[in-house]
């Protein structure tokens, strides 16, 4: 398996653009953590995050909201745009096992 950051950011981009968790399911460490700048509590398992993301994607499909994810070669984050106006980034951290250890959603200004 490719373990470059581009491999992982492309998988996350694919998941968000297709509103389908399958591109990232096998790439998350069991002890994966997810945090959001806008939410106080952190998720602490891959299972918890994937369940959350399934629900999030279902809500986005039902609402008809347009979400676009962008992969930027060589960067450790993706950019999300919702309804052509709300932009944020998801920064990924990969561990020594070659799995995604965490994802942090935050304002795009914090992504570099």
Question: What residues fall within each predicted segment?
Answer:
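Charged, low-complexity, helix/coiled-coil-prone segments
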Residues: 1, 34-37, 102-105
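Intrinsic-disorder-associated interaction segments
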Residues: 1-2, 46, 99
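Short, low-complexity N-terminal intrinsically disordered segments enriched in polar/charged residues
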Residues: 1-22, 26, 30
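Short N-terminal micro-motifs specific to bacterial/archaeal maturation
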Residues: 15, 39-40, 91
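A solvent-exposed, acidic/Ser-Thr-rich amphipathic alpha-helical stretch
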Residues: 22-71
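A beta-strand edge to alpha-helix "cap/lid" segment located at domain peripheries
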Residues: 50-112
């Amino acid at each position: 398996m490719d373990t470059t950051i581009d491999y992982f950011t492309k998988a996350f981009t694919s998941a968000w653009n297709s509103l389908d968790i399958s591109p990232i399911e096998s790439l998350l460490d069991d002890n994966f953590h997810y945090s959001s700048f806008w939410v106080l509590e952190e998720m602490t398992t891959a299972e918890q995050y994937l369940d959350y993301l399934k629900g999030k994607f279902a809500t986005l499909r039902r609402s008809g909201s347009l979400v676009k994810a962008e992969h930027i070669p060589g960067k450790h984050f993706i950019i999300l745009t919702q309804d052509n106006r709300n932009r944020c980034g998801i920064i990924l951290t990969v561990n020594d096992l070659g799995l995604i250890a965490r994802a942090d959603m935050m304002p795009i200004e914090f992504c570099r």
